[in-house]
Amino acid sequence: ITDADISARGPKAWDDMLNTINICKFNIGSGATGIVTHSFYESLNHAAHRNVYGKYVTDFPHVKRLFLDSFCRLAAMKLFGLRATDYMRAASAEDKRYLLYNPIMKMKVAIQGEEVHEMLWDIIAAKGFEKDNYFSQAVVELRGFPKLEGTRHVNMALIAKLLPNFFFNPKEYPEIPRMNGPENDDYLFQQGPTRGYGKIQFHDYNIAYNSVDLPNVNVFKEQINAFVEWLMLSGMELKDQMLGDFDFLLAVGEIFTLVAYGQLIIESAAIEEIDEELLNQIFDVFVRDFSRYALD
């Protein structure tokens, strides 16, 4: 290796490496979304043409529920990805909110993809093992996505550092529009030093949640309020608990992640003009997820 082959040395080399990961990890969520979308329609096509006991598989109540939840989770994955893209492209030295949303895109969206795939597999059963369909290969590839660039525990420990500022120290920012034009993405190639991660501030999550009045979103808001109250009562002891027990950190981090996840989905739904019935049903799934994480 010659000097001509080395692009950076010292602290800059370290910063460039981590900043490259900040961007590349985003593609893990995008890849999972694409894989699951293909598997969803392949599974639906199979089930809609398979007749069992005089009924098509898609007519069974439990299959309807599995397809409904799968569709809602997949729609949420896509909506989050669209909005997270906006924050990544709008990033600057003064606005580094993407450093929360990109890890969520990598970890949360990829794991959601696994959950959707498991539900689809419950529908198509043995068909998922056959080598002449897409699903069998998707199973192999999708399982590895959440493990790329660190385990979920590592990513959650990183995200948890942002919890205090997210809930208790919001900052006003100009509203970020849809960023799907030919804007110059030069900041993504010059992100600067990687220090100061825990000092990043975010816009008030209540702005998004208060912009809609839907039954399941309102229940979800009650859950958020209960979580915030618990955080306030826990105080500084919470940090010590999370550092000493990674399973506890994972459960707390999952709830925090779900709040930010839902926030961007509401923002994205408004931009994409998503039907309120679909948004309400997505939060039906989230209310159940929130309860499960709280029990953990």
Regions found by a protein language model. Give the residues of each.
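Flavin-dependent oxidoreductase catalytic core characteristic
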Residues: 1-296
